[in-house]
């Protein structure tokens, strides 16, 4: 089993700290710079690539980072994660979001259930429901098709699904796969819900309430606001709402919803876009086939993340460079600048993914980190 040690106790980190600094202005200029752009690129899944030519590294730094990864047993720790080890020691839980899109290692069982089978079953249920909505088997009270889907959630129940929807919306329009327009309500300020409700035809809107516990105050407050708006419009809210929650929540078997789809405690909210949290709204918006393709792409990238060769593992390489920038070069922040308008909400999603995960100063209840946590993403 891999062992966990503070970064500053590793011999390879000390060696990394002593490597000569790279001056980007020198290495990025002229023919040498052009060659560097070609050389410092790692293939990703689905035709993408991770280019780190503009990062303050060279071959000597990369060699030191590879040594750090080996001493820190990064690949081994990731392998333990996807094989079902208790990685979330604070809550004594497995970490299983990767199982929502594929299985990298052994079958993982928790609470007497094969978790990959559980997530696949929920995806199949969502696909069946979405298809029935699209073909008119499930309609509003007047027998008319729903034309808009509105997700009600907060934090990871909003940031990831919203970023994914906006990333795919124009592509879907161009490829005739936009089935329903999607909107999102997340702010507990009633102006947020009011603005969305004023922009949609509530008689033809289907609302997705997302709360793992079924008790999230902000989300339930917004649900009450929406229910009141539906009531004022003479509509039965139970015919316009579905829930995404856990099987043990008070929402799971409530008559207030057309259907309930399930997630569990082994998927953190910020990682939940490929679970039912993202699956319901994205399948309704674009169709189950598009969401399935999204999962396939995520699974393909997951496989690269398991590669023990750092130079063939873009996720591990980027993480290591981030450690170097924060703890050796001393950079306090990282700017995320999407040139694509479709990715306009990606920075907010990434902020939660990275900073909520890697910004914690406590390793456990009794152990504080002696090194810097992640940089602030802006």
Model-derived regions, located:
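Extended, charge-enriched "interface" segments that sit outside catalytic cores
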Residues: 6-141
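Glycine-rich oxoanion-binding loops at beta->alpha junctions
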Residues: 119-135, 164-165, 170-203
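Conserved beta-strand elements of the Class I
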Residues: 148-150, 206, 335
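Conserved phosphate/anionic-ligand binding catalytic regions in large, soluble enzymes, centered on
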Residues: 149-163, 271-276
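A glycine- and small-aliphatic-rich helix-loop capping segment at beta-alpha/alpha-beta transitions
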Residues: 159-175, 199-201, 223-231, 255-261
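Extended, hydrophobic alpha-helical segments in both membrane/secreted and soluble proteins
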Residues: 160, 164, 193, 209-230, ...
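Active-site phosphate/pyrophosphate-binding segments
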Residues: 229-369, 375
């Amino acid at each position: 089993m891999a062992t966990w040690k503070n970064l500053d106790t590793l011999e390879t980190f000390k060696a990394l700290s002593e490597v000569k600094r790279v001056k980007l202005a020198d290495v990025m200029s002229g023919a040498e710079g052009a060659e560097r752009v070609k050389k410092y690129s790692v293939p990703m899944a689905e035709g993408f690539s991770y280019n780190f030519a503009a990062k303050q590294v060279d071959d000597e730094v990369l060699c030191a980072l590879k040594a750090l990864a080996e001493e820190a047993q990064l690949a081994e720790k990731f392998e333990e994660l996807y094989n079902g080890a208790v990685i979330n020691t604070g809550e004594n839980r497995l970490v299983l979001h990767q199982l929502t899109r594929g299985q990298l290692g052994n079958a993982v069982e928790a609470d007497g259930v094969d978790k990959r089978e559980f997530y696949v079953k929920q995806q199949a249920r969502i696909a069946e429901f979405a298809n029935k909505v699209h073909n008119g088997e499930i309609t509003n009270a007047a027998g008319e098709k729903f034309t808009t889907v509105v997700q009600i959630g907060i934090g990871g129940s909003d940031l990831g699904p919203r970023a994914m929807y906006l990333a795919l919306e124009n592509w879907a329009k161009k490829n005739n796969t936009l089935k329903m327009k999607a909107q999102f309500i997340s702010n507990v300020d009633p102006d947020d819900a009011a603005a969305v409700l004023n922009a949609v035809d509530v008689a033809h809107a289907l609302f997705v309430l997302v709360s793992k516990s079924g008790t999230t105050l902000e989300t339930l407050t917004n649900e009450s606001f929406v229910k009141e708006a539906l009531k004022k419009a003479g509509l039965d809210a139970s015919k316009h709402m579905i829930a995404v929650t856990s099987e043990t929540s008070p929402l799971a078997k409530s008559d207030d919803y057309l259907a309930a789809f399930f997630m569990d405690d082994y998927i953190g909210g910020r990682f939940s876009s490929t679970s039912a949290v993202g699956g319901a709204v994205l399948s309704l918006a674009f169709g189950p086939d598009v969401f399935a393709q999204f999962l396939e792409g995520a699974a393909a990238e997951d496989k690269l993340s398991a590669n023990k060769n750092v130079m063939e593992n873009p996720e591990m390489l980027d993480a290591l460079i981030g450690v170097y920038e924060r703890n050796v070069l001393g950079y306090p922040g990282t700017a995320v600048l999407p040139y694509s308008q479709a990715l306009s909400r990606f920075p907010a999603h990434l902020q939660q993914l990275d900073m909520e995960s890697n910004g914690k100063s406590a390793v456990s209840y009794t152990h504080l980190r002696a090194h810097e946590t992640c940089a602030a993403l802006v």
